[in-house]
Amino acid sequence: MRARSFYSNLLFSLGLNLIIKPTAIFIIDAAVQNEVGSAYGLYFVFFNLSLILSILFDLGINNYSTRLSAQNIEVSKNYFSTVFVLRILLMLIYILGIVLLKYFVSISWTEYKLILLLGFNQFFIANISFFRSYFAGIQRFRLDAFFSVLDRLLLIFSMGYILYLLPDGHKLVSIESYALVQFGCYLLSFVIAFITAIFILKPSLNQIHLDRILPILKDAFPYALLIVLMTLYTRIDAWLLLHYSIEDGVR
């Protein structure tokens, strides 16, 4: 029975991802690229940079939460509020980093707003993944699968309406508007995931133990190291190309 349930959940997750994610890539993302042209390259650079900086939001906490909730859900619930507060503190550090970035990197105000917006998007993504780690830990795999595609599903409906149904909607499409629509989709997904996590897990929201933050970071460090190395390896090339093109006066 357990094996049947496992394969059923696995097929459900694979089915959702095979339908929703390719649709978002080929129907929405590709259409936006065609509309904005070369400006999408700038979006890609800042998306990669925001992804690198999003390491601050995770630090291996999601993998740590999945393991902890699978081992002892009651202990994991007690850590919920503490970890969430930790994420807010890391978000403040990230904002400070973005503010300092403006003084060390030659970017325009429009580009600065774009990277800030994409950074907030990564913050919502990281927290949605955090909630999903609890759902996976308590073996609510269908719920985990649903929230893995909810933001893209919302993006398909919202950007799909602008691109294909709204008269002259293509005139509204720009890198800034695309990032803004993504922001709305991630924000809504974050709110729904947060409410669902509170309803299902019923964590102790009033139990915030700041003295547990350092032990949590210490336990999550092995996961964080893997994330840091893989993210830098796969994402830093676009930012380096932009940096050197600015120095050479190409851009």
Regions found by a protein language model. Give the residues of each.
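Interhelical loop/hinge segments that connect adjacent transmembrane helices in multipass membrane
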Residues: M1-F6, K171-A179, V191-T234
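Hydrophobic alpha-helical transmembrane segments
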Residues: Y112, L116-G119, F146-L201
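Alpha-helical transmembrane segments of multi-pass membrane transporters/permeases
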Residues: L10-I19, K77, L116-F120, F135-Y161
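Signature of the first transmembrane helix
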Residues: R4-N62, I95, N121, I156, ...
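Helix-loop interface residues and adjacent transmembrane-helix termini in multi-pass membrane transporters
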Residues: N34-G37, S108, G137-I138, L172, ...
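Alpha-helical transmembrane segments of multi-pass membrane proteins
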Residues: I52, L56, L92, L96, ...
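Transmembrane-helix boundary and interhelical linker motifs in polytopic inner-membrane proteins
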Residues: R2-R4, E35-A39, L53-L86, A136-R142
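Alpha-helical transmembrane segments of multi-pass membrane transport and lipid-handling proteins
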Residues: L18, P22, F57, S81-S108, ...
